[in-house]
A protein has these predicted regions:
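Short, well-ordered beta-strand core segments
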Residues: 2, 22, 47-49
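A short acidic, Gly/Pro-enriched loop at the edge of an enzyme's catalytic core
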Residues: 12-21
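Conserved SAM-binding strand-loop segment of SAM-dependent methyltransferases
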Residues: 1-13
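Short beta->alpha connector loops
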Residues: 8-9, 28-33, 113-116
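A short SAM/SAH-binding and catalytic strip from SAM-dependent methyltransferases
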Residues: 20-34, 52
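S-adenosyl-L-methionine-dependent methyltransferase catalytic module, highlighting the catalytic core
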Residues: 35-43, 47-136
Length: 136
């Protein structure tokens, strides 16, 4: 089943339903309360796949050094048109998972071409453009 709901508003309608997997694709950074959303989703699903852009990527950092809000192929919107509320890096997200005791079962770091690479895997906070997590 596919269910779409405003997760910022809560997911009370689905408590106790016991989904196997929930997917939050490139949306965690758009939520008002991402920590609460992750807590709530893991109450109704055994696992959650979360994908997020890495705002610590070197290309975005370079944009900031130039004095402008950065954009990239993964984040093409201008600062005044973006839905992103919480800009986080891979290190920030993994820190939140540790803080909340969310078990990261698997993680994949993707470069700007959308593939895994030695640089993205070795220095993900600097060279990964996006990350994919399986948490439970």
């Amino acid at each position: 089943s596919v269910i779409q709901q405003d997760i910022d508003g809560g997911i009370q309608n689905y408590k106790g339903m016991g989904f196997d997997v929930a997917i939050m694709a490139s949306s965690i950074q758009c939520l008002r309360r991402p920590r609460n959303a992750m807590r709530n989703i893991l109450q109704v699903a055994n696992e959650c796949v979360i994908t997020l852009p890495n705002f610590g990527n070197w290309e975005l950092r370079l944009g900031l050094l130039k004095g402008k809000m950065p954009s990239s192929a993964q984040l093409p919107a201008k600062w005044y048109e973006t839905k992103n509320l919480h800009l986080c890096t891979i290190a920030d997200f993994e820190g939140l998972c540790a803080e909340e005791s969310f078990n990261i079962k698997k993680k994949v770091y993707l470069n700007t071409r959308g593939s895994s690479s030695w640089l993205a895997n070795t220095f993900p906070n600097l060279f990964a453009a996006e990350a994919v997590y399986l948490i439970g």
